[in-house]
């Protein structure tokens, strides 16, 4: 993907020659601040709609949001096992895209794969409803707990699953949002209201 390559190249050039004591974490935080992302306070109940809710990433976000106590709805173009699982959690799912589903929402979010021209996004903006990216929504969730982000090019899901399992075994009762189901738990996302939140952070976040 040439566009992504250009973005990465520009980011690498902007980093320049860093002082030897500058850490990778400091560079990441610096880059994040420059992106000007928006957040929303999720400590109080919100009404949220998720566009493209049927994928593993957004279905995990939906699961965490509804378990936090928010009123969640979603849309996708086809039914799936994940859609059924979300409906069993009490999430209202619309198959197909309908601009009217965003009425009354506090904010709308969605998969990075969904075009900005999507009719539900357009309707939300017409109504001055905030539209947050998945990364912005995830960052807003992270503000509600002490968050442990697992990043990297390989092994994020495995490492996140191991960390979650270890913390559960230690009685820490963590919340978690992982890119795949933890085999021992048969799910990849949960909100426990505990102190810790384990989150798998991919390149889109």
Residue ranges and their predicted role:
Residues 1-36, 157:
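Nucleotide-activated sugar donor-binding and catalytic core shared by glycosyltransferases
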Residues 8-9, 22, 75, 96, ...:
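Residue-level detector of family-conserved "landmark" positions at structurally sensitive sites
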Residues 36-137, 196:
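N-terminal leader/targeting and accessory segments in enzymes
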């Amino acid at each position: 993907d040439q566009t992504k390559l250009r973005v990465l190249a520009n980011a690498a050039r902007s980093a320049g020659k860093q002082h030897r004591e500058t850490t990778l974490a400091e560079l990441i935080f610096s880059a994040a601040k420059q992106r000007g992302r928006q957040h929303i306070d999720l400590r109080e109940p919100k009404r949220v709609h998720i566009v493209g809710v049927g994928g593993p990433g957004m279905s995990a976000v939906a699961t965490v949001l509804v378990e936090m106590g928010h009123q969640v709805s979603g849309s996708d173009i086809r039914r799936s096992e994940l859609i059924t699982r979300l409906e069993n959690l009490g999430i209202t799912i619309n198959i197909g895209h309908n601009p009217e589903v965003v009425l009354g929402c506090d904010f709308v979010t969605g998969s990075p794969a969904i075009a900005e021209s999507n009719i539900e996004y357009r309707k939300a903006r017409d109504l001055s409803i905030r539209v947050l990216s998945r990364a912005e929504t995830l960052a807003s969730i992270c503000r509600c707990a002490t968050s442990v982000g697992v990043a990297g090019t390989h092994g994020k899901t495995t490492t996140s699953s191991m960390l979650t399992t270890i913390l559960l075994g230690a009685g820490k009762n963590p919340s978690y949002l992982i890119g795949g189901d933890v085999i021992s738990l048969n799910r990849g996302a949960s909100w426990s209201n505990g102190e810790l939140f384990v989150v798998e952070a991919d390149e889109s976040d």
